[in-house]
Amino acid sequence: MAAVSRDLLERLYAAPPDGFVAARSAAVAEARAAGDAAGAREIGKLRKPTVAAWLVNLLALRRPDLMAELVELSAALRAAQRELRGARLRELSARRRDLVATLVAQARALAEASYPDVPVGRLPLTEVEATLQAALSDVEIAEQVRSGRLVRAVSYAGFGEVPRPQLRLVT
């Protein structure tokens, strides 16, 4: 996707989903008018995000500091799980709950501040929370979330890293 500028991607994925198709069509027309047929095709392939994905994209694009903290925390959680450190897991789990709650509140605030016409009371914040929890559990999902180009919410139903740590009986 080298033909599509980062600025354009950020502009499209930070805008509310109801305006995505019109903005994408305008960008395609602009690229065609500039003689960039390959760029126009690439822009035309971009998928419209769901409202939940848009909220996560807002976090990634406008609060990269908090998203970096999420990724750091996910690495710490995986390490504590791999090393079977119960006390550390409990501490990190409390931090996880606080950070996810902060991120969900930030998503709501960003939507409300940036786009006053968005019905804040009907935002799918549970899907946002599920996506953030999935990002904590899976490295690939975390990278998708951090990209700011998510097109749909994600959930995770696993039990930790695969392969699981080798357990041994201590007598």
Residue ranges: model-predicted function:
Residues 4-5, 51, 73:
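N-terminal alpha-helical segment
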Residues 8, 59, 65-171:
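Amphipathic alpha-helical coiled-coil/helical-stalk segments
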Residues 11-19, 43, 61:
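A short N-terminal beta->alpha junction/helix N-cap motif
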Residues 1-15, 22, 32, 165-171:
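Actinobacteria-biased recognition of intrinsically disordered, low-complexity terminal regions
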Residues 23-65, 78-85, 91:
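N-terminal interaction modules that seed assembly of large macromolecular complexes
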